[in-house]
Regions:
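Non-catalytic accessory/interaction domains
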Residues: 6-8, 13-19, 23, 27-30, ...
Length: 469
């Protein structure tokens, strides 16, 4: 039996557990756990046993909490409603919207959370005040902050106590354009990075503003995992969510800034490696000499291991700065499996119709391992080659039923997801996908689901591009 693991389950599970701690109170929660373990040592228990102890120590009835948090789907959106008088808050309401998925949900959950006010002091963005409160229903007043001076940043779910989509007001967005990297607390920064990414994906923040915020704070970020994720998000923002009329300018801005950061990164460190990867993903034609220089070993301290050499080589190949013969020369230095996989990706990324046809035929007709298939997919579908890839829209749809019917699930599902012409973000692609689904509504449910998810990615990108117009 095939199933898809829902990654959100892990994130939501951790956040909901944290919300339970906040809802009952940390000390009450710990006391309840002590009682629970003492009472039920060496016995089997149920959720009800734990809830009884939590209710006893906290004084809160938890059955309604369990019903809404553990037995309903979707995530609520929380946004501020603010009124200012004499430069002070006369009104701060938290507006809660039901989940957009499942469609038709009216679920409004109780949240125990904090709202924080942050001020610019010197070069830093510092928390002035953070008040906890119970949020319920469609609107909740934050009474504890009324009369406070206007802050530079107002953050709902300060300290990450609940599970919700959070929105920022315009003043807070403008503050982040210059000061997201000036927040010393790593948790607060991570929260804000997640919030602006979600706002971008939901077309509530333009790609132009998102990129400005990201570039202002990226160099100051101290968590290498966050930097890695931000690099991926920056590429997606430029290539998928930016309005086409803004894309080239934003790519130039991003790549120049990343190169500046790379020049300042500590030699031989993890951040230098990661900024090199980000630079290679965004490099413009004007910067190809700089990238070639890096490949030639002219960036102080950078370790050019096999992975890094191939990453840079393939970035140059993708942009027409290196040829197939250069790929062969690189492979001759190391014929390991990792090198062969990178070589296969490079061949598929050559910006010619002939190279794309060869890669497509390998994906469609040849029996190749999943590892090689993934690399060829990756090389074939390059956002820098949009015009070249237009020719493969119709063949994709023409081969859907045959690939699904004759290939293994692993191969057929990767074809549906990875060969979908995602570089062609347009209403025409959405319409073409909808038309295929309508005409083939008796096709396998798994195929239709995967295709619908791919289409929804384009719908999301179109909305983001419209926001960036």
């Amino acid at each position: 039996m095939l199933f898809r693991s829902d990654g959100i389950t892990y994130a939501k599970g951790a956040s909901v557990l944290q919300q339970l701690v906040a809802h009952t109170g940390r000390e009450n929660f710990i006391a309840a756990l002590r009682n629970y373990f003492a009472k039920h040592a060496f016995k089997n228990t149920t959720l009800e046993d734990l809830l009884k102890e939590l209710e006893a120590t906290s004084g809160r009835e938890l059955k309604p909490w369990v019903a809404t948090w553990l037995q309903t789907a979707g995530v609520n959106t929380l946004r501020p409603e603010i009124e200012i008088k004499d430069n002070k808050y006369s009104k701060i309401n938290i507006l809660q919207a039901p989940p957009s998925i499942p469609v038709g949900s009216k679920e409004l959950r109780p949240h125990r959370l904090a709202v924080g006010l942050y001020d610019i002091r010197g070069e830093k963005l510092i928390r002035r005040e953070s008040v906890e409160l119970d949020v319920s229903g469609a609107s909740t007043s934050v009474e504890g902050l009324l009369g406070e001076d206007l802050a530079d940043l107002l953050l709902i779910n300060d300290r990450d106590m609940s599970y919700a989509k959070v929105r920022l007001d315009d003043r807070s967005i403008n503050t982040l354009k210059t000061h997201i990297g000036k927040i010393e607390d790593e948790l607060t920064r991570s929260l804000l990075w997640a919030i602006i990414w979600d706002m971008l994906r939901d077309a509530e923040l333009s790609a132009t503003d998102f990129i400005e915020i990201l570039l202002s704070g990226l160099e100051s970020e101290t968590n290498i995992s966050v930097v890695t994720q931000l690099g991926v998000q920056l590429h997606t923002a430029v290539e998928s969510y930016a309005n086409p009329k803004n894309r080239d300018a934003l790519r130039n801005k991003a790549s120049k800034k990343i190169y500046e950061i790379l020049q300042r990164a500590r030699a031989g460190g993890d951040f230098q490696l990661q900024f090199t990867r980000i630079f290679a993903s965004l490099v413009t034609n004007e910067q190809l000499p700089e990238l070639r220089n890096i490949l030639n070993g002219n960036l102080n301290g950078l370790v050019l291991d096999l992975d890094m050499r191939w990453l840079i080589t393939n970035a140059l190949v993708e942009r027409g700065a290196l040829s197939e013969s250069d790929l062969e020369a690189e492979l001759s230095k190391d014929n390991s499996l990792a090198a062969q996989l990178a070589h296969a990706q490079g061949l598929a990324s050559i910006p010619t119709a002939d190279a794309k046809a060869k890669a497509w035929n390998r994906l469609i007709k040849e029996e190749i391992s999943s590892a090689f298939r993934e690399k060829i997919h990756l090389g074939f579908m390059r956002t820098t080659q949009r015009d070249l890839l237009k020719a493969w829209i119709d063949p994709y749809f023409e081969n859907l039923l045959e690939m699904w019917g004759k290939k293994s699930y692993d191969i057929s599902s990767s074809y549906v997801e990875l060969c979908y012409p995602i570089t062609q973000i347009s209403q025409e692609l959405v319409d073409k996908t909808n038309k295929w689904i309508m005409e083939n509504d008796k096709a396998a449910a798994g195929l239709l689901r995967l295709l619908g998810e791919a289409r929804d990615t384009v719908v999301r990108a179109l909305a983001a591009q419209a926001k960036d117009a």
